[in-house]
Amino acid sequence: MMIAAVTAAALLSCDKTERPAALDGEGMIAVTIVDTTGTFPGSTQGVPSVIGEAKVSLQARTHEYSAGDESGEDGVAEFDGLPAGEYSVFARREMPIGAQKKVFTGYTDMLVEGPGLIADTLYVSTVTVNALMINEIYYCGSNYASFYFYDQYVELYNSSEDTLYLDGCILTRNFPTVEGDLEDIDHVRAIYAFQFPGTPVTGREHPIYPHQYVVIAADAIDHSRYSANGYDLSGADWEFFNAFGNDYDVPNVPNVLNINPDRTTDFMINLSSNAIVLATGEEWHIEEYINSSGYPGTRVTLPLYTVIDGVEYAANSDHTKELTMRVDAGFAGVGCAKYSGASVERREVGVDTNNSTFDFVLIPRGTPGYTHVQ
C-alpha cells in the first residue's frame, strides 16, 4: 500500500538569530494543536478544531534537551523550565484505518530568548502511512582507522497485526543529484536498486510477520572480527548481493538482488547523507543519463505511487533535500559522525509521520533485529 497523502503542515517559525548565550532555564513554551482539514472526527474543513491527546515532543536545536507532553482537551501542550535556545516542536495523533494509519502531524520552530512564556499555534495536516516501514538504517561506518563501513544494514518492521509480504519489493539508495523541482517530479531515481525475490504485490512467499524486524545486511557476516566496533550481522535475515560484480555471496542467507546490470558494486550507503526508499517493485525501469563529467550512465526510476516508505538522512540539518517532501519532509541522522558506529532508528516503534526529523533518533549503537525503545 502506498502513501496517499503528505505532510504539508503550516510552519510558524522564528527567524534565525544568534544563539542565546545564557542557559537560564526559566523559559516556557505553550503550543495549541489545531486541525483545519476537516478530517478529524467532529471537525469541519476550514474551521479550526483543537486536537486533544496528541503526543507532543520538544527537541532543542542549540543544545542537548528534549521533553514530551500530551495535549489536553483544549489542544494545549506546555513545557517549562527551558534554557534559552532554538526548539522544534512536533505533534502527532494517530487513527488506525485497516493496515494503514491516518496520522495528524505537524511541527514548528520556536525561539526562547529568556524567562517568560512563548505561545504559538501548531497546525497539523494528515498523512496516511503504511504498516511496512523502514525502522533503522546503519550507514556511517564503525572504524575510522581502517575506514570500515562494510557492516551497513537496513532494518524493516511490520507495525500491523497482519502478515505482510516482501515479495518483489525494491530497496534503493537515492540518486544524489537533484534535477528540477523535487516536488514536481512523480518518481524517485536510484543509484542502487536491489529487489527481493517473488512477485510484487501479489506474491506470498516471503512473509514479514506482525511486529517482526527484518535485517538486510550489506554483508551477512560477523564484522566484529574485522573491526573492533563492527556489528555481528551473521544472523541477518537477508543479504544485499550483486551478481553483476565480484560480490561475495554468504551461503544460507537469502539474497536481495541488484536489478541494474551497469552497477557492479554492493549496496553501499553513503556515510553522510542520502535517502533509502522501499517500494513495491510493481513498476520500474532503467533510464540513461549524462553525469556531471559528461559521461553516460544508467539509473533505476520508480514511480512515486509505488513507494512504501522513504527515509532521508544527513549529518547537517541545512543539507539540500534529495527526496521529495511527499515521502519524507525531514532528515534523520543530524549530527551523525562518520565511523562512529552510530545508527538512526525510529523514535517510537511503528510511528511514521513521513518526517524523519521527528520520526528518527540518533543512537550510539545500532540494534539489528530489535529496538532501543524500552
Put a short name on every predicted segment:
Residues 78-86:
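Short Pro-Gly-centered beta-turn/loop motif in secreted/extracellular proteins
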Residues 10-13:
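C-terminal motif of bacterial Sec signal peptides marking the signal peptidase cleavage site
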Residues 15-51, 90-92, 100, 123-341, ...:
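Activation on beta-sandwich/Ig-like modules and their edge loops
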Residues 77, 118-120, 214:
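Short strand-edge motifs at loop-to-beta-strand transitions and within beta-strands
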Residues 94-120:
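Structured interaction patches on ligand/partner-binding surfaces of diverse proteins
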Residues 61-77:
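Short, acidic Ser/Thr/Gly-rich low-complexity loop/linker segments typical of extracellular
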Residues 73, 83-84, 210:
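Surface-exposed loops/turns
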